[in-house]
């Protein structure tokens, strides 16, 4: 396998960037012309002694903004652990470096826009969860890697990567077109990775959890739901659990993704906006594309739909059920499980009903296993595709239970667990397992919803607690604020980073400056003034109680009435995306 370079130095001169490969026996230098933007391969002798030098740990890629081209590099990394003897790193800090030496060629308006775009890139890079390896392909599962050709093994990491999970694919377009420079390009995945060295019965093994977020139809909670015309589902995540013991490798894969037809749930200041199923499109085309690709990638599908079967979520459950029936594909099976109803009043033990319901199917699907000689002993023949509304909190709880059941059989088969022993009884490992799955939930939730996950007290401890309920309430409030007042910026940031929106070289019309309606400023001011006057009238009573009551009723009515008008026009007051708004209106 062609590896990427691990040790790099960035040399900066006014005319060029030189990225020097410092691996033993390597003379390659990547040269980027800051004026022509040409990228070429040269030698170490071409690096001027006057260049400013710094260590970097990878090139994330290049992107065009208003000021011109920018180079994005990884400046800090943290080792997560070793996966099958390959070092896995988390990128923890980045630098965005302009090709241009000055900004004198920009107008004030362009400077402002360029600063805004830089802020968007910085925001995406500040979200925790970017991982890479220079010697292991993190974009593929063990099973996919085992079923590849010798030609595939000789490809560079960038060339062979599963493009669904390469978050810097857009930034590396120039590298993709030039095979000779691909060793300088590192595919970066976004999601979560935990690697733990564990011991049960004196037997040491590595336990790994990997969640890969798809960069297709990526975005934030309320602005990206359902699927696009290609069948890509919002918040699609592939989660792989790996065991490495004495040369044996086992893995179990699950997926999650938004309900795969055309629906939306735009923020409108209400705590829980009502989901809307589109009536203007043919749902079956995209629905079929989605499951066709899933069957090709993973085999049989068991859909676990965990949404409520009453209230605003009910139409989505009914539509999903009807769509699967209409699909008529024997490879896709549908199971609805009303998570909140079944587990109401803290009866979380009732999740075992679902686990037992799918137990026979899970045994039939099996798991992937390779022995010490590299021989494939068993394949995973199907997958559980779980979803709730957000594919976060409820989904993660169910996935952790199914993964534990698979792990039980894997460890028994490998001889780590004795006959009759259960994972739940291994206190030290159980703590590692629960915390890793809770951390996985938090990572996926922060990346999609902007806060940590709900219900993680159950994942960490196996039971629901009062403190957990309190923290869920706090996280729900933070989600409400972010979903209504900052998610437009977050969505724009992701669209810019992934290339869904591109800044043209001849940048003229700004998409960022949208004329604000008068009511956007006037109504909140009127409401605040009216509410303040109501409080003042209560605190500073008039000569008679009737006079005080009249003032309080007047200002109170004005405050409530203005608030009602704001709520009625809620969509006008939320922070909406500006860059790719139309495409998000499926």
Curated annotation (Swiss-Prot):
The keyword Hydrolase applies. This is Phosphatidylinositol-3-phosphatase SAC1. Keywords: Endoplasmic reticulum, Golgi apparatus, Hydrolase, Lipid metabolism, Membrane, Transmembrane, Transmembrane helix. It holds the Pfam family Syja_N. The chain crosses the membrane at residues 520-540, 548-568. It is an enzyme of class 3 (hydrolase). It comes from the Eukaryota. Residues 541-547 are lumenal. GO terms for biological process: phosphatidylinositol dephosphorylation. Residues 1-519, 569-586 are cytoplasmic. It is a multi-pass membrane protein. One of its GO terms (cellular component) is endoplasmic reticulum membrane. The keyword Lipid metabolism applies. GO terms for molecular function: phosphatase activity; phosphatidylinositol-3-phosphate phosphatase activity; phosphatidylinositol-4-phosphate phosphatase activity. It comes from Xenopus laevis. Residues 121-450 form the SAC domain. It is found in: Endoplasmic reticulum membrane; Golgi apparatus membrane.
């Amino acid at each position: 396998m062609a590896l990427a370079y691990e040790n790099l130095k960035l040399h900066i001169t006014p005319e060029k960037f030189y990225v020097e490969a410092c691996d033993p026996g390597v003379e390659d230098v990547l040269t980027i012309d800051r004026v022509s933007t040409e990228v070429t391969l040269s030698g170490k002798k071409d690096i001027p002694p006057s260049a400013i030098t710094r260590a970097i740990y990878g090139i994330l890629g290049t992107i065009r903004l208003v000021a011109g081209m920018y180079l994005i590099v990884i400046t800090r990394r943290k080792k997560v652990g070793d996966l099958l003897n390959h070092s896995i790193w988390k990128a923890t800090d980045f630098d965005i470096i302009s090709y241009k030496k000055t900004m004198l060629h920009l107008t004030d308006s362009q400077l402002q826009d360029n600063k805004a775009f830089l802020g968007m890139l910085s925001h995406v890079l500040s979200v925790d969860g970017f991982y890479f390896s220079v010697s292991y392909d993190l974009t593929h599962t063990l099973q996919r890697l085992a079923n590849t050709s010798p030609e595939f093994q000789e490809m560079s990491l960038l060339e062979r990567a599963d493009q669904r999970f390469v978050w810097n694919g857009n930034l590396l377009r120039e590298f993709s077109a030039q095979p000779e420079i691909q060793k300088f390009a590192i595919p970066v995945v976004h999601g979560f990775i935990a690697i733990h060295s564990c011991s049960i019965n004196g037997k040491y093994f590595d336990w790994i959890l990997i969640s890969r977020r798809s960069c297709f139809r990526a975005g934030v909670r309320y602005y990206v739901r359902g699927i696009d015309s290609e069948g890509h589902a919002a918040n699609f995540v592939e989660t792989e659990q790996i065991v490495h013991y004495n040369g044996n490798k086992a893995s179990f894969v699950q997926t999650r993704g938004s309900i795969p037809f055309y629906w939306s749930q735009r923020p409108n200041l209400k705590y829980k906006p009502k989901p809307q199923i589109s009536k203007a499109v043919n749902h079956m085309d995209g629905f079929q594309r989605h499951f066709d690709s899933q069957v090709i990638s993973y085999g049989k599908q068991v859909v676990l739909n965990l949404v409520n079967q009453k209230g605003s979520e009910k139409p989505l459950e009914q539509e999903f059920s009807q769509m699967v029936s209409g699909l008529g594909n024997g490879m896709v099976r549908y199971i609805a499980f009303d998570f909140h109803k079944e587990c109401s009043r803290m009866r979380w033990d009732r999740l075992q009903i679902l686990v037992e319901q799918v137990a026979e199917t899970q045994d039939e699907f099996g798991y992937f296993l390779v022995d010490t000689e590299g021989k494939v002993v068993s394949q995973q023949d199907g997958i559980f595709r779980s979803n709730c509304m957000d594919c976060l909190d409820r989904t993660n709880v169910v996935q952790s239970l199914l993964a534990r059941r698979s792990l039980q059989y894997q460890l028994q088969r490998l001889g780590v667990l004795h006959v009759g022993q259960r994972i739940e009884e291994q206190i030290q490992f159980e703590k590692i397992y629960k915390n890793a799955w809770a951390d996985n939930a938090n990572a996926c939730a922060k990346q999609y919803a902007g806060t940590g996950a709900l219900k993680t007290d159950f994942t960490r401890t196996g039971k629901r607690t009062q403190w957990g309920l309190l923290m869920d309430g706090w996280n729900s409030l933070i989600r409400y604020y972010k979903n209504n007042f900052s998610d437009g910026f977050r969505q724009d940031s992701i669209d810019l980073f992934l290339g869904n929106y591109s800044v043209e070289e001849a940048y003229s019309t700004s998409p960022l400056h949208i004329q604000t309606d008068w009511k956007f400023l006037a109504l909140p001011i009127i409401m605040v003034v009216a509410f303040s006057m109501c409080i003042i009238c209560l605190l500073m009573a008039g000569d008679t109680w009737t006079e005080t009551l009249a003032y309080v009723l007047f200002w109170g009515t004005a405050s409530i009435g203005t608030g009602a008008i704001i709520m009625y026009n809620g969509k006008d007051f939320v922070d909406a995306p500006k860059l790719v708004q139309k495409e998000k209106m499926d």
